[in-house]
Structure formats: structure tokens, C-alpha cells
Amino acid sequence: MTKYIFVTGGVVSSLGKGIAAASIAAILESRGLKVTMLKLDPYINVDPGTMSPFQHGEVFVTEDGAETDLDLGHYERFIHAKMKKSNNFTTGQVYESVITKERRGDYLGGTVQVIPHITDEIKLKMGEGAADADVAIVEIGGTVGDIESLPFLEAIRQMRSNHGRKNTLYVHLSYVPYIATAGEIKTKPTQHSVKELREIGIQPDILLCRMDRELPEDEKRKIALFCNVEENAVIGCYDSDSIYKVPGMLHAQGIDDIIAEQLQLDLPQADLSAWDRIIDAIEKPDHAIKIAMVGKYVDLTESYKSLTEALKHAGIHTRTKVDIIYVDSEEIERDGAESLRDMDAILVPGGFGKRGVEGKIKAVKFARENDIPYLGICLGMQIALIEYARDVAGMAGANSTEFDLDTNFPVVALIDEWVNHDGKIEKRDENSNMGGTMRLGGQQCDLVPGSLAARVYGSTEITERHRHRYEVNNYYIQRLEQAGLTISGRSAGHEKLVETIELTGHRWFFACQFHPEFTSTPRDGHPLFIAYVKAALAHQADKQAS
């Protein structure tokens, strides 16, 4: 039987429940358990796919094409399990499923209510997501006390009755503030947060105290007494300069031994040596580079979470401190791209909408003309192709139909047919719904032998994850290739969509339609980002030598 660990958060949001949950998972995995993770989101949206990055942050795409919470990215980076659609569900999905069953007559004329029907559906979906794992760690989104979270909290309360104490464990992450003017740590917010949980019927087994300083023993005893938790189960979760230090931090305080004892697990000792090597590379870099990330969501860097982590992973594997300089593309649109001259490399990430596009085009042109390593991802590839069409291939005014429906050269256009992750043909047009209608998930790509892409990946067949609605217009490919653009990768399906482009006369110029950042991990990195960081290092060395 799968054992469940439920992680809740209290006092304030954005405490790092996802990191804490993923760190616990990493420790348990290192002790030989098969671990999976679930995120339960209390918002009514079916998924975050149509939500603004400024509200929700990054949308993480799974291999099977689910648009999910960014915490699933943390899960994949901390443990070896690959997330699926069943690892993330929302209030919207739960209600949609229950209403569908009611319309179908599944409830035999009964009155459909939050309890038991909604809570039963939540438990059913948790069971599906947990599958055949030894342990499933379930993170409940939101903050204890929010009305939206109540059905989820009731469902996890019932799980102890359904599965027993030896198969369920509750972890509560709470904020313990330090009041500088008083010079005191305040435990009252945590006491009240636990009181809220206990009123619902949940008694935390472990308390994680989110703090900016170490938790004194007397305060630990106080929290244990008033929250009815064993003193050794009151664990500090402190600010850290790297999220990859958290597994070691929690393990040092014995969290995995507490879990093993309550869940009656006989486990080998934890082996966190891989995490020790990661931390060593982070703390002792041999090099340092500056990469300009030119985007439109730079005021909320969570929008590019997987991408920034992928660059850090590449830094780990090249022992390089990667300093990411976030550049607002609207500033470049207004002031020009000269500010990018001192950068060791330039990157244009994915995005949607017209705002800031011309600034990104200027950034690509600057990288191309000044032989600065360039990496374009998703929209960043489309932007590179538009710039090349305009400034090299002689297609004045070339654009994407996303930004200009009346352009004379629609070199990027709405994709209307493709083969999805399951091998089925998908069709879309301008009248299709916005939600869940993009080209999503892992897709096979064939690379040209001898190309930069093939050399980087060490293969001519790869699979990468996608999330886009627009594609390179194949009608203009021949003209672009005649002007010197290299199409080095295409989709494996009959539609042969453009997946990667290169400039062979450039130091290092590569752009891809897919999102390689979604499969990068601190343990293994990703070959594309590692190659990109190496190119930036080479460019830096040449600048210093000249």
C-alpha cells in the first residue's frame, strides 16, 4: 500500500512548500524508496495554461502534455520520477469531473455535495496520482485558513481514517518571523496556524519552521508544547542561498528518521553524496559569466523558473557561476541593444503576445551581427527567424501572424495540424478554445547529422517538450535556407515542423521551438545548456585575450 505524506502551509503564502516537499522526497528516494509527488491546487481554473505569468509564474509542461504548476518542475529536479497529468489537479478539474458524473447519472439521483462527492473525487485523484509508489508526497496549495483549500484539507483528513496512522503523515510548514524592533522570534502565528488545522481535524506530525535564522531550543520547546508536536519533530527550515541545500538541511535534523518511524519503514541510511557534489560545484566555481535574458516577464522571474534553474545546472556541470541579467525587451525596443555588448551570451526565452517583440528582434540582431553566443527558446526561435527573414533574406516586414495578421511575409503562423504525444493527429484553428489547445508535451525531433544540434545532443533523434501555438511557415523555408539559415531539426511526423535553426558562420547561434529547460536537473544538467555555457566561456576568453 502507498503511504502518504501531506504537506500544508500556514501564515503566509510563498513559503516554499514545493521545495520543502521535494527535499523530503529527495531524502526518502536516497533511502531506497520509490517516491512520487502530487500538487493539489485550490483555484477553479482547469489548469494554469491560460493564467498570466504575473499571477501564477511559470507553467511547467510534463512529458505527457499537461500544463501544470511550477512546483512540478521542482519535483522533477529533486527526484528521478517524471511527473504526469495525474500529478497535478485543481478545484476546477475536480468539479468538472463531479458535474460530468452527475449529468451521466452516476450518483443515482442523489444530492451532490462537497462532502462526500467532492472530497471523494479528490481522494480518487490522489490515488490515481500516487499509482504504485512506495510513498506519495502530496502538497496542498494555498494557505491554511483560505476558504478555497477546505475541501482538500477535509479530504486529506479523511485519508487517515481510510488508510490508518501508519500510512499517513502530516507535515505543516509555517512562518516563524523575527521582529527586529523587539529582537524576538514570534511563535504565535505558527500556534494559530496549527490551531486552524486542528479545528479541521488535522494534527501535524512534523512542523517545519520557515525562518531567516536558527531556531533556539527554548522556542522549539515552546512550539512543541503549544502545537502538540514532539520536540524533535519541530524542524528549522532556514533561508538558503541555494534550494539544493535544503535536503541536507532537513536530513541533518533527522526528518527522514521521524518519517520512517511513524510510517513503519525499515530503510537503509540516506546517501546524499550526489547533493554534496552539487553544493560543492555551486560554492566553488572556477569561472563566472554574464548571460542576458531578454524577455517581457522580467519583473517576475518565477515566469522563467525552469530556464533559470537549467542555466544554473549548466553552471554546476561546468563549475561556472552563471549570473543571469534580466533585460526588459521593451527597454531595448526603446533604447537599442548596446547594453548587451558586455554580455558573454544572449538568450531570448518563450512568451506570448506582441508587447516587447521588436526589442527581442533587436537583441537577436545584435547577437548575430556581433558574434555573441545566442540561444533562442520557443518564441526566441521564432524571433530569430523573423529577424533573419527581415535583415538577411530580404523579406521586409516579415512577422508572425500572432503579431501582425496582415504581414506580407508570415514566416511564422498558427499551427493547424500536428501529431501529439500519443501519436494522434491534432487539429486547431483560430476559432479553437484557448485552454489546452497548444502543441504540448514530449515530441520526437530528427536532427541533421553533423549539425550543431546533433553534436550537442550526441544523437540525431531526440525527444523534447513543447508548448506553443505558432510554428515556422514551411512555405518560406527554401528562401531562408538559400539566404544561409540552417534548419537542423524537424519534427518526426509527416508535417515535418521546424524544430531547430542554426547559423553555421556564427560562433554559436542556436534556437529551438521546444523547451529543453523542462528536462534539466541538477544531477545531470542538459546538453544544450551545458554547450551554451561553454560557448559563453569561450566568448569571454576571446574578449579577454583581445
UniProtKB/Swiss-Prot annotation:
Residues binding Mg(2+): 71, 139
GO-annotated cellular components: cytosol
Region (Amidoligase domain): 1-265
Pathway the protein acts in: Pyrimidine metabolism; CTP biosynthesis via de novo pathway; CTP from UDP: step 2/2
Annotated active site: 378, 515, 517
Gene3D superfamilies in alphabetical order: 3.40.50.880, P-loop containing nucleotide triphosphate hydrolases
UniProt-listed InterPro entries: Class_I_gatase-like, CTP_synthase, CTP_synthase_N, GATASE, GATase1_CTP_Synthase, P-loop_NTPase
Protein name: CTP synthase
